[in-house]
């Protein structure tokens, strides 16, 4: 079962793409068949390469909350890790700042 903060591979693509689930627990529990996500890029990118990113230490990678997307829950595979509550909060703050 997908939960808030999970990092999961996309199963609707031929490429190896990962996303982090930004939907809160209420949205996930509502079981709408959709979740709010953003891309997760495995590995490190240079600190000055992009603005509005969130660095993740385990698994090592970067969230791109500026590129928020709705996906069907069925498009996600088994989670490979989680971003943690601090990183999830930071990503949600970036998304909120972009639309307020």
Regions found by a protein language model. Give the residues of each.
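Compact nucleic-acid interaction/catalytic patches
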Residues: 9-53
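C-terminal terminal-subdomain/extension
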Residues: 56-100
């Amino acid at each position: 079962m997908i939960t808030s903060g999970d990092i999961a591979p996309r199963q609707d693509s031929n490429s190896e793409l990962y996303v982090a689930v930004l939907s809160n627990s209420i949205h996930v529990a509502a079981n709408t068949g959709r979740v709010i996500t953003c891309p997760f890029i495995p590995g490190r990118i240079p600190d000055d390469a992009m603005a509005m990113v969130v660095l993740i230490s385990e698994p090592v990678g970067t969230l791109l909350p500026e590129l928020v997307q709705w996906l069907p829950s069925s498009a996600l595979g088994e989670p490979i890790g989680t971003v943690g509550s601090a990183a999830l909060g930071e990503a949600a703050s970036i998304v909120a700042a972009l639309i307020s």
